[in-house]
Design a protein with these regions (language model features):
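Transmembrane beta-strand segments of outer-membrane beta-barrel domains in Gram-negative
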Residues: 1-138, 195
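C-terminal transmembrane beta-barrel domains of outer membrane proteins
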Residues: 92-255
């Protein structure tokens, strides 16, 4: 694990519409400066400074039909050994993560669909995957757990180099009250699979998370977005036990 900061730049180009599809391509670079904490069993953790500047090429697509709202995305992330002289050497990467290398490659993809029935009920589904050719440092790994991935578990409880995560959510029609808009109640199933490449002997290298639960979301006064989820884990996680109960809550403002 580690902490740090980053800054970057991105250029985007919107492609011509293909039927009802909206498309966009983007190219970006991020300059990351992190302090990775490396710990061994029965040893004090050490901090490894790590700098790297990955280049990301991405595609995103969006389609809004009469009943379906579909989104998709694919991104390719290329690690660079040194970009304009910025970047740590291979030894620093190997120390931060066994067999990690600054010249890494990551493929990410996601797709989501929201189907609205004639009654106003909705069935929402999404899946995201990540694949790589080698072990990654913590900033590039695939994480699962928490309100926006697998509810019922702690945020980013499980981490892997490759993985897949999916969710299916059945929502009621939207209700409206004075001062309340788009209030829905839903039930869901979340799941994820993650795996480490080249794990150390003492490391657990594979994680399977799954949960079911109930939740509600609403918008108040056209400004506040409120969401509350209850999650029931179906499997043990790294720190969460099967059958534990967890509530997730978020509130945000949009103007």
């Amino acid at each position: 694990t580690g902490k740090g900061h980053s800054f970057g730049a991105k250029i985007s180009h919107t492609l011509p519409m293909t039927g009802a599809w909206w498309h966009q391509l983007s190219l970006g670079v991020s300059f990351n400066d992190r302090s990775e904490e490396v710990g061994m069993v029965d040893q004090k953790a050490q901090t490894v400074p790590l700098k790297y500047a990955p280049v990301t090429f991405a595609y995103s697509g969006f389609r809004q039909g009469e009943r379906h709202l579909v989104s998709s995305g694919v991104s390719l992330v290329f690690g660079t050994r040194s970009l304009f002289g910025y970047g740590s050497d291979a030894a620093a990467f190997d120390w931060a993560r066994y067999k990690a290398d600054p010249s890494f490659f990551v493929l990410k993809a996601d797709v989501g669909d929201t189907l609205t029935f004639g009654t106003g009920m909705q069935l929402a589904s999404r899946i995201s995957v990540q694949h790589t050719d080698r072990p990654l440092t913590s900033g590039e790994q695939f994480a699962a757990g928490g309100m926006y991935t697998v509810r019922g578990y702690r945020s980013a409880e499980a981490i892997g180099d490759i993985g897949a995560q999916g969710s299916v959510e059945l929502r009621t029609r939207a209700f409206s009250l004075p001062g309340v808009q788009d209030w829905r109640i839903y039930t869901y199933f979340d799941g994820a699979w993650l795996k480490l490449k080249e794990p150390l002997p003492e490391q657990e290298d594979e994680f399977k998370l799954g949960s079911v639960g109930l939740g509600t979301s609403l918008r108040m006064f056209d400004t506040l977005n409120v969401r509350l989820d209850y999650g029931y884990p179906l499997t043990d996680g790294p720190t969460t036990t099967q059958g534990a109960h967890r509530l997730h809550f978020s509130i945000g403002a949009g103007f």
